[in-house]
Amino acid sequence: MKKQLAVFLCALFCALLILFHPAATDAAKEGFLVWRDSVMPSLLPFFVCTSLLRQLGALESGNAAALFALAFVSGAPGGARLCAQYACDGEAKDGTQLLAAALNTVSPMFIVSAFASSMLGTPGAAVPILLSQLLAAITAVFFAKRAYGVHLSATAKEASLPLAHRFAASITEAVSSILSVLGAIVFFFVAIRLIKETGMLHLLLFPLSALFPGLDAAAAEAVFSGMLEMTAGAKALGSLALPLRIKSSLGAFLFSFGGLCIAAQSLLFFPVSLKRYLPFKLMQGLLSGMICYLIFPLCFFGTAQAGSVTAETLGRNAVTAGFIFAVSLLGTAAVMLYSAILGKRRRRK
């Protein structure tokens, strides 16, 4: 059944690519430009450095603090990429999978330079976003280690090679990895555009619109896009006419969740189980968004709009905050329901 469904979806996707070829081409170009201008400059240098450190054996001891620091600085899918050396024969324990998920956070360089400075036009907004992402990631790592007693040890020793050879191999590995990331970004940019062109987006967002009548449609579309492809959602958030506090909180949610695109990128490097990965990341994103909303006044003393705060503004902010909560819970419920169905089928077999 799963195979037939996958074949049907692939055939449908190909048909939509033909029917909406101009829009799909524009979306692919947009995804490539986002990768070229934002993702590749922030990730490639760190991919080279982390690859070299791994080949030098710096992470063989499984030092969690060093792993966390490298993953946080390099950005997603750095967590999955760094944890790949702890998988044995293409498989990983549940705790290691959750640890890789917790370490998949967006690069601070992207948040500061691309999102806060370029998209929001307010560099100071990066402070509460980074703090909330850091606190949510630390909480998630602590949970993974406490709940599963994660013990990290490299499954294979790196071969002894001259430093020059290791450096060359690190560059080759980093370029290959960043090109794989490009493929995932372009695919999801095109998928989002096709969903919009076919009108399916309004259908998918209808339950949320009915639940929250005052919800801004553009904000709903931005968050939905971000849950598929994080950079697309971040770009859409930057153009919204919402208070800076709300946009920052929504951004923090998306950056800690990462979206399906980063989940797909993680699969390129590490054997994560999506039925564990996605609910865990949804909760991490929800926690990050709430933390950002709470600490924003303490970290950022500017104001996002002129004039007094009206009841309408407070109501819109409350609805948007509720939307973050609803999206996370609905997404978690859907993924958990799917996981439960899969589990029952496996037990029957």
Question: Where in this protein do the model-derived segments appear?
Answer:
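Transmembrane helical segments that form the transport core of multi-pass membrane transport proteins
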Residues: 171, 175-252
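Intrinsically disordered, low-complexity non-transmembrane regions of multi-pass membrane transporters
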Residues: 149-173, 305-311, 315, 339-349
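Alpha-helical transmembrane segments
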Residues: 38-43, 125-141, 323-328
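C-terminal transmembrane helix pair
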Residues: 91-95, 109-110, 138, 244-337
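Hydrophobic mid-bilayer segments of alpha-helices in multi-pass membrane transport proteins
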Residues: 4-15, 42-48, 138, 154, ...
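Transmembrane helix-loop junctions in multi-pass membrane proteins
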Residues: 18-29, 54-59, 113-114, 120, ...
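Alpha-helical membrane segments and immediately flanking helix-loop junctions
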Residues: 62-120, 222-240, 247-270, 278-282
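N-terminal signal-anchor module of multipass membrane proteins
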Residues: 2-60, 174
